[in-house]
Amino acid sequence: PLVSGQARTGISDTMRPGDISSLAQSSERAFRVTFGGSMPEYRDRYWRGLILDTLDDGTWRQSGYDPYQAPGRVNVDGGVGELKPGEYDVLMEPTDQRWAFALEGSVAVSNNVIKKTDNLFRFRRPADSAVRYRLALEGGDEPAAEALLPGDARRYLQLPSEGNPRARALADELRRSSDEIPAGDSSVGDIEVIRTLLTRFREQPYFYTLRPPKMPDDGIDSLLFDEKRGFCAHYAGATTFVLRSAGIPARVVVGYQGGEGGAGNEYLIVRQY
């Protein structure tokens, strides 16, 4: 176990970055991927795993998580043959969780993984041993964004009633500035809010560090206005908070980026760091 205030890189179904003052990089393998065709470009290798959409007392969690699991042990092999172009096999290390990782625009091929309505993939049972599953990338143009259901929109705007007042004021300022732009489509104002916030992170002296100061109280305010140092969880949580405060539905998507080639680029290894 790690001492208080420390953590290791990897995936969890909760996120509370304000309590972490040291993030140790783990080189343990998360999963290995073999492609039936060419390997995607690095920018296209984002492996989505789960969504955190509820903030309570500084902790991001999943809401509406499906607790159902089939009896018995996880099916460790989907029982499919040779890889076809566009398909890819994932050999995932044990996690004792039901989530599976996939690229954007994937569909299930093997019978041991299912696609949920939120475009995430799940096993029917927790992965208590290494699991191999197969997915395929859908061809054609990038799918158009779907309109949010009313329940999803409410959930992706949820915030505690109090806390982080400076971040809320920043969101109000960004919204007022965007409302000054003449446009017939309110989404243009939303895009301007997002663009301005991301420009703030790029142009002001914000830094990425694995050794941030602890920010337990109003941690998003501390990150945005005082410390300006953190790792990916800090910035993801702060961005989601500000966007929700500005009236823009947002959520934290958890996963891995990239991967390194192995055996002459015959497969891809994604590690915990």
Predicted features by range, described:
Residues 1-273:
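Helix-boundary/low-complexity linker signature
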